[in-house]
Regions:
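Short, small/polar-rich motifs associated with maturation and membrane association
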Residues: 1-267, 279-281, 926
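Extracytoplasmic gating/loop element in the C-terminal half of outer-membrane beta-barrel translocons
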Residues: 183, 354, 358, 761, ...
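Alpha-helix-centered segments that form part of catalytic cores
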Residues: 195-219, 436-437, 443-455, 772, ...
Length: 942
């Protein structure tokens, strides 16, 4: 069952040797910043998912897969809508900054989402936009336990883009030429169009469908095997995980048949009690990852290569189409070793000497390799002999990651045919050769990169109870890490001292003060340290006399928090992060005399500002948690409002203009803290649990809503409607359309559209916002929220039903309130672009009243293809993200065997999308298609 305790989501299913129950632990421990806490003592801004239990009924392949379906505050992209500019939320795996995609769900015990500023303040600057704590599994005292899991399934393509065939494309391209110039001659004759459309000779008159089953499969396999071994005694315990998966590819020709991704991983976690006072743990993980692909970007070619190209020559032509009497052609063909399947040669044209099909067959292959080694060790010392409740913890970690690319880089020849028709049959009478076959047989290495992470933390902890009612806690922490990345001079660093002081009376009244002294090398001396304080107050109303004996309320907790976090992760201007407070002088410009001597002059390109300071996250939040009717319903809801203040500007408009000149390109303006952004919103998680006869049901609903606003922005515009201040941070700005021009008279009577291309009937007409009788960038207005940091409202629904030994699980997620622009090459078609099916709704004189697409143009159509509400669409959607049915073999069958537990399951992921724009949302352009995943798995515990 899925049960959410206050601020806590736990997925509960039958344990491996017991029976299912709606009951849960009274107060499970939750990993938060630098400590574990009983869930009942959490003060808001924290949500957690018990992944170990969830995996028993929901098999996943990614650690953060659809977590928005279980908790509030996480929308799949961000925590509380915080941006990911320069750096987003911090991910810590076992307390060390690591990537979420390098730990598999089978390795994870628990994931904690730290949303509120009060929850992340102890981590310092790098966690200013939230943190996700991933805790891996640990061993437990007891006998040896072995768990084996095997999965196999198929990724099935959801949809492919639809493009016009050769004949239709050629017809419409001729139309585009006439649209641009009514006196233009057609590029393609009626005979050529007929030949390409009839299929009379697809090798001479190509009509290439890149999504044909000749090249693309409907599905590809993914298989995975995992072994988990754990056990130990009172003194030492261990957990190990060995896993391997391999994923195929949808392409099914040439070298691409062998496209694959595979990953092998070994993890070992050991806990040792050295004595009654000292314990330690060691975690190690090694990952080997490979991605092999054929040369050539097939999916990009599928979105850009026209169906009739190369002209007069299909990329692959049968050898037997060569006239037997054309001996010179046959002799020339004998110089190549690239005869595909013994019967096709590589073809093209002088203008197209390469193509993606030939690349896949003859250009070689490329393999990206990644190796990661992660190690961390911790020490825990009980100092009760010094002071009751005192302890010390330390953690040290070293991670290495390296990656490189190996490739076989071959070159190939293509043969350009000369066609003739003998007795009604097309034959090749001559060939010309472009390029040469070159297979050096050497493996090339490129793109080598590496990354090292070193992390350390040490802390004194104090926890004690006085008089049985006064509970006191405290932590004094020194924490820091550095990441060294190849080809980057400056390391990514985070260093801070932190203090936590907590008190509660009878677990009824709570007060918690947290503070961090953060440090940044990005700022000038004297400004590199700042204090980040946070205060949280909590009140458990259910312990008050007026609610203590309530038959409805089991637990009711309310808390409020105020925080100011100082961060340096957004201290960025362009590509520069360091020494932004310093002035910059250059001698790059000058002049030269005709007789040779040259002079350089020294100019300032940036002024100095030693007062440059941290960006601040100022936040107020409130949290309400409740358990009702003996845990029949649990509720966790939060409200938040925060302001990110002091974003940098480098060309302040409030400086006199003479401090910045265009020629020479000089400036005395200094970088300043100025811009502010605000976010306000709420999140919730509601769960209901009920048993109906032999059926246990659990229903969970979670959601996150946030609204953004630019509260301060350095900007100057002539018109009020252009100001970004007061509008959403993720606002989409563009022109307001007013249909399509019907004729030249309407164009002449309308404002002049200075948008880079000649306006003709069938082009998009725009509204002149400022009344200057000109359409340009000054007429752009706010169009809607882009949802860049996740949809404004995110919804999650999960349902679990258990009957006897069957468990049914379903998960749905939704995103609402955002807008997008249809601006891919599928929609914005001009010049020599490939024509998609969308152009069938184009404007013509005959369809002027019903057209859904602007006129076609063989030139640039920048007037039409720019951000405007003509291309705007709502991104509202609801997805059936997962369905799984699990069967657990009854213990009555297994009790006399060496198998403790045996279960089998079938599942489907990414099954359905409900949206007005479903076809658009399920279609990828220029990349591999989206897929549904159908899986079957089995798990055995020994």
């Amino acid at each position: 069952m899925l049960v959410t305790a206050p601020a806590l989501t736990y997925a509960q299913t039958p344990d491996e040797e017991g029976t299912d129950s709606l009951a849960r632990k009274e107060s499970p421990e939750v990993q938060v910043a630098f400590r574990k806490m009983a869930q009942k003592d959490l003060l808001g801004g924290v949500s957690v998912v018990n992944v170990e239990e969830l995996t028993k009924k929901n098999y996943n392949t990614y650690s953060l897969d659809n977590m928005q379906g279980y908790i509030g505050g996480w929308n799949g992209n961000s925590l509380w809508g915080m941006d990911g500019d320069h750096a987003g939320y911090l991910v810590l795996v076992d307390g060390v900054p690591r990537e979420a995609n390098n730990v598999m769900p089978s390795e994870i015990a628990q994931i904690t989402f730290l949303k509120g500023a009060q929850a992340v303040v102890l981590y310092g600057s790098r966690a200013a936009k939230g943190a996700i704590l991933i805790s891996t599994k640990r061993g437990h005292a007891g006998g040896l336990r072995v768990s084996l899991r095997a999965n196999t399934g198929f990724n099935v393509a959801k949809a492919f883009p639809e493009y016009l065939g050769s004949a239709e494309y050629m017809t419409l391209y001729n139309e585009a030429l006439l649209n641009d110039d009514p006196s233009a001659k057609p590029l393609y004759s009626a005979e050529q169009i007929y030949n390409h459309g009839s299929g009379i000779n697809p090798y001479r008159y190509p009509n290439i469908n890149y999504y044909s089953s000749d090249y693309v499969k409907k599905a590809c396999n993914r298989s995975e095997a995992t072994a988990e071994i754990s056990g130990g005694g009172q003194r030492a315990r261990f957990y190990s995980n060995v896993s391997y998966y391999r994923t195929g590819d949808l392409l099914n020709f040439g070298e691409a048949k062998d496209n694959m991704i595979d990953r092998f991983n070994v993890r070992g976690n050991v806990d040792v009690d050295i004595n009654r006072f000292i314990s330690t743990h060691i975690n190690a993980n090694a990952t080997f990852y490979n991605a092999q692909n054929a040369k050539g970007d097939y999916w990009n070619a599928a979105a850009t290569a026209r169906p009739n190209f190369p002209q007069n020559a299909s990329p692959l032509i049968p050898v037997d189409l060569i006239d037997p009497n054309a001996t010179s052609a046959l002799e020339l063909l004998s110089t190549t070793s690239n005869i595909i399947d013994g019967k096709y040669f590589l073809s093209g044209s002088q203008a197209n000497p390469t193509n993606v099909f030939a690349d896949n067959y003859a250009a070689g292959s490329i393999k990206w390799t990644s190796r990661q080694f992660q190690f961390d060790a911790g020490l825990d010392i009980n100092l009760d002999k010094v002071l009751k409740g005192l302890s010390f913890n330390a953690l040290f970690a070293v991670d290495y990651a390296t990656s490189y690319t190996t490739s076989f880089d071959n070159k190939y020849a293509i043969f350009v045919p000369t066609w003739a028709n003998y007795n009604g049959k097309d034959v090749i009478v001559a060939l010309s050769k472009e390029g040469n076959d070159e297979k050096p047989g050497t493996q090339n290495i490129s793109g080598s990169s590496d990354k090292q992470t070193i992390a350390f933390s040490g802390q004194f902890n104090y926890r004690n109870t006085f008089g049985g009612v006064h509970n006191v806690s405290g932590m004094l922490i020194a924490n820091g890490y550095q990441q060294t990345i190849s080809q980057q001079y400056h390391r990514i660093s985070n260093a801070n001292l932190a203090l936590q002081l907590g008190y509660n009376y009878r677990q009824r009244y709570y007060a918690d003060f947290d503070a961090a002294l953060v440090h940044s090398a990005k700022l000038a001396e004297g400004h590199r340290n700042a204090l980040s304080p946070s205060l949280t107050l909590g009140w458990r109303l259910s312990e008050e006399g007026f609610l203590k004996d309530s038959p409805v309320i089991d637990d009711l907790m309310f808390s409020v928090s105020g925080s100011i976090l100082n961060q340096d992760i957004d201290l960025v201007v362009g590509d520069n992060e360091f020494y932004l407070y310093k002035s910059v002088w250059t001698q790059n410009d000058g002049y030269a005399w005709y007789d040779g001597p040259a002079g350089k002059y020294t100019i300032s390109t940036r002024g100095e500002n030693d007062g440059l300071s941290f960006i601040q996250r100022k936040e107020f939040s409130a949290n309400l948690r409740a358990s009702l009717w003996q845990k029949l319903i649990t509720v966790d809801a939060s409200f938040f409002i925060n302001s990110m203040e002091g974003y940098l500007i480098d060309q302040p408009t409030f400086y006199p203009s003479h401090l910045n000149t265009g020629y020479p390109d000089a400036s005395f303006m200094a970088v300043q803290n100025f811009n502010n952004n605000r976010r306000i919103g709420f999140d919730f998680s509601i769960n209901a649990n009920k048993r109906f006869g032999e059926v246990d049901l659990s229903l969970g609903v979670s959601g996150t809503y946030y609204d953004t606003k630019i509260t301060k922005r350095d900007e100057i515009y002539d018109n009020a409607y252009r100001y970004r201040q007061g509008k959403p941070i993720d606002g989409i700005w563009g022109l307001q359309s007013d249909g399509l021009f019907r004729n030249e008279e309407e164009i002449a009577a309308s404002p002049e559209q200075k948008l880079g291309s000649t306006v003709r009937p069938g082009d998009i007409k725009y509204v002149d916002q400022n009344g200057d009788n000109v359409i340009d960038d000054k007429d752009e207005i706010y169009l809607g929220k882009g949802g860049w940091y996740g949809s404004p409202f995110t919804l999650g629904i999960n349902l679990t039903a258990k009957w006897k030994d069957f468990t049914f699980f379903a998960l749905g997620t939704g995103g609402f309130g955002g807008y997008g622009i249809k601006n891919s090459s599928y929609y914005w078609v001009d010049g020599d672009d490939k024509y998609s099916a969308i152009v069938r709704g184009r404007w013509t004189e005959a369809t002027a009243e019903t057209a859904t697409y602007p006129r076609l143009s063989a030139k640039s159509a920048s007037n039409n293809f720019r951000t405007s509400d003509y291309w705007l669409y709502k991104t509202d959607r609801f997805d059936l993200a997962k369905v799984q049915i699990t069967y657990d073999l009854p213990q009555s069958i297994l009790h006399n065997t060496f198998i403790r537990n045996l279960s089998a399951y079938v599942s489907g992921a990414n099954l359905l999308t409900f949206s007005k724009e479903r076809k658009h949302m399920e279609m990828n352009v220029g990349s591999a298609p989206q897929t549904r995943f159908y899986n079957i798995g089995v798990k055995a515990v020994f």
